[in-house]
């Protein structure tokens, strides 16, 4: 059997990325898809202008803040309800239905409701939390269900209560799944924050996207969109590193 060396695919991934960026630049410069698809160099020129750069960076900070709060709130809600589902199995059907219902309804449809209830400042955080809740709940609930039964039964036989066995066996075993849920939820949290900013928030990348679209500032629109992608990827990469640490530390 031939085994690939660790990281052996990195040069291929880098080459693919460079090829994609070169193709984007060539298509943008050729005008093949019109002015709505600018070259990367044109988009990068937006950051040369001090006013545009400061606007985008302030908006990025606001969106990242909303997404961070939303991811945290979604994670707390998912953590509490998944643990409740594991400790009290009678609640499982209802909590599973709640998670499915939140996932089935498009997040953007909640926007007008939360504008009235929570206000424009809080709506990006709430939509971000809703977007993050489902993947974290499903991942953690699955991890708790497949926790090692033998170790749990041994703890109970040795006199541990159900709650104590949960804290000593089930939850530590499910931690890698919980972090995996965080990793999968992070891009959705950013998207939820951006969608929430479309409903009247005063600041954020979503506001810049709408403003750029209305004023036909195509390069600035693309710059804001690429910052959203960068923010999502950065969160995913950081949480992937945390997931590897959790897997090495707690995986059975």
Predicted stretch roles:
Residues 126-130, 163-196, 222-223, 235, ...:
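Transmembrane alpha-helices
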Residues 89, 145, 176, 180, ...:
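C-terminal transmembrane helix and the adjacent membrane-cytosol boundary/short C-terminal tail
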Residues 139-184, 205, 209:
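Short cytoplasmic-facing helical segments at TM-TM junctions of multi-pass membrane proteins
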Residues 100-135, 142-146:
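Generic hydrophobic transmembrane alpha-helix motif, especially the helices
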Residues 116, 191-228, 247-252:
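Glycine-rich helix-loop "coupling/hinge" segments at transmembrane-helix boundaries
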Residues 1-18, 237-252:
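Transmembrane alpha-helical segments of polytopic membrane transport and secretion proteins
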Residues 2-5, 29-73:
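Periplasmic/extracellular loop-to-transmembrane helix junction in inner-membrane transport proteins
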Residues 69-99, 112:
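Transmembrane-helix boundary motif in ABC transporter permease subunits
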């Amino acid at each position: 059997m031939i085994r690939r060396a660790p990281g052996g695919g990195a040069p291929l991934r880098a080459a693919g990325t460079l090829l994609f960026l070169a193709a984007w630049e060539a298509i943008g410069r050729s005008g093949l898809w019109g002015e709505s698809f600018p070259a990367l160099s044109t988009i990068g020129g937006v950051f040369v202008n001090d006013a545009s750069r400061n606007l985008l960076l302030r908006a990025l900070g606001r969106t990242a803040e909303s997404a961070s709060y939303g991811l945290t709130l979604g994670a707390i809600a998912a953590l509490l309800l998944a643990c409740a589902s594991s400790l009290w199995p009678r609640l499982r059907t209802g909590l599973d239905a709640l998670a499915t219902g939140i996932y089935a309804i498009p997040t953007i449809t909640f926007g007008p409701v939360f504008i009235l209830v929570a206000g424009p400042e809080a709506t990006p955080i709430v939509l971000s939390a809703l977007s993050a809740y489902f993947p974290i709940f499903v991942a953690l609930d699955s991890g708790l269900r497949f926790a090692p039964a033998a170790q749990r039964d041994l703890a109970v036989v040795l006199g541990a209560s159900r709650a104590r066995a949960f804290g000593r066996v089930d939850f530590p075993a499910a931690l890698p799944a919980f972090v995996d849920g965080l990793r999968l939820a992070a891009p959705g949290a950013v998207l939820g924050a951006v969608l929430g900013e479309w409903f009247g928030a005063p600041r954020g990348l979503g506001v810049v996207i709408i403003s750029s679209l209305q004023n036909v500032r195509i390069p600035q629109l693309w710059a804001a969109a690429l910052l959203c992608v960068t923010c999502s990827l950065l969160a995913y990469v950081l949480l992937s590193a945390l997931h590897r640490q959790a897997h090495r530390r707690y995986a059975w």
